[in-house]
Amino acid sequence: MPEVETVRRGLTPHLSGSVVTFVDLRRPNLRFPFPDNFEEILIGAKIERIDRRSKYLLFRLSNGYTWMSHLGMTGVWTVGSEGKGKHDHVYFEFDDGMKTAVYTDHRRFGFMDIFETSNESEQKWLSSLGPEPLTDDFTAQVLKSNLHGKRSPIKSALLDQRVVSGLGNIYVSEILFRS
């Protein structure tokens, strides 16, 4: 989760306010296939802001859609790249004619999706996420309630994104070591 927030903060000053003018999907899929209408929805849309929910980057677009990016384990966003590397899978150009962004993912564990922002609460990747650990929604009582009835080892339970959203293996291991 902290890594995704760092990426969000890094992309925001470069991409917020930019209009997507070109998209080059250099393969039909990452972890999952790209939506059929991915390029058509993106081209001409302005990135109004970039949010984060759990491990997902949410690019809020002017056309009423949200473009979602999950980095997986090895996904990287680079602004200003020509995108000619072997693992540069998605290349974007923006309205100033000079700005570019590239999504690179050596292992292709990341993925992208696009959906109508008004339907976000029903979106399959986001609808069942639990509270994030650094928000006011996360309390000892909420954690207790979300763990109630779990029969798995505590590490597996904490990695379940329905219980606590945004925790990965490294953070859960550190939490359990310190507890």
Task: Please provide the spans of the model-predicted regions.
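Structured catalytic/nucleic-acid-binding cores of DNA maintenance enzymes
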Residues: 1-179
